[in-house]
């Protein structure tokens, strides 16, 4: 599901809100989440999961085109850990 599909679905389910209002709310929520992660804080949404930063240590990688070694710096990357309720709901899905 894309962001625009999510906005459309929420606007349909919440008929008292316009698509523009839903879009604004989604954008603001995502902006607040990004800002929180930028400061190094953790985000926890009970029943859904938590977002945090994980550190990736410096390492030696390879350029896939040339095969030469490339030194990669350490960096922080966003990490999502699903909550128990979300894990259980997804586990119940039979493809």
From Swiss-Prot:
Protein name: Integration host factor subunit beta
A Pfam cross-reference name: Bac_DNA_binding
Protein family per UniProt: Belongs to the bacterial histone-like protein family.
Key word Acetylation present: no
InterPro entries: Hist_DNA-bd (IPR000119), Histone-like_DNA-bd_CS (IPR020816), IHF-like_DNA-bd_dom_sf (IPR010992), IHF_beta (IPR005685)
GO cellular component, as recorded: chromosome; cytosol
GO MF annotations, alphabetized: DNA binding; structural constituent of chromatin
Gene encoding the protein: ihfB
Function, in words: This protein is one of the two subunits of integration host factor, a specific DNA-binding protein that functions in genetic recombination as well as in transcriptional and translational control.
């Amino acid at each position: 599901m894309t962001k625009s599909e999510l906005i459309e679905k929420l606007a349909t389910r919440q008929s008292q809100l316009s698509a523009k209002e839903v879009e604004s709310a989604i954008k603001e929520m995502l902006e607040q989440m990004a800002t929180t992660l930028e400061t190094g804080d953790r985000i926890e949404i009970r029943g859904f999961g938590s977002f945090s930063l994980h550190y990736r240590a410096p390492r030696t990688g390879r350029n896939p085109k040339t095969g030469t070694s490339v030194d990669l710096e350490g960096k922080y990357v966003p990490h999502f850990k699903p909550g128990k309720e979300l894990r259980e709901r997804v586990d119940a899905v039979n493809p």
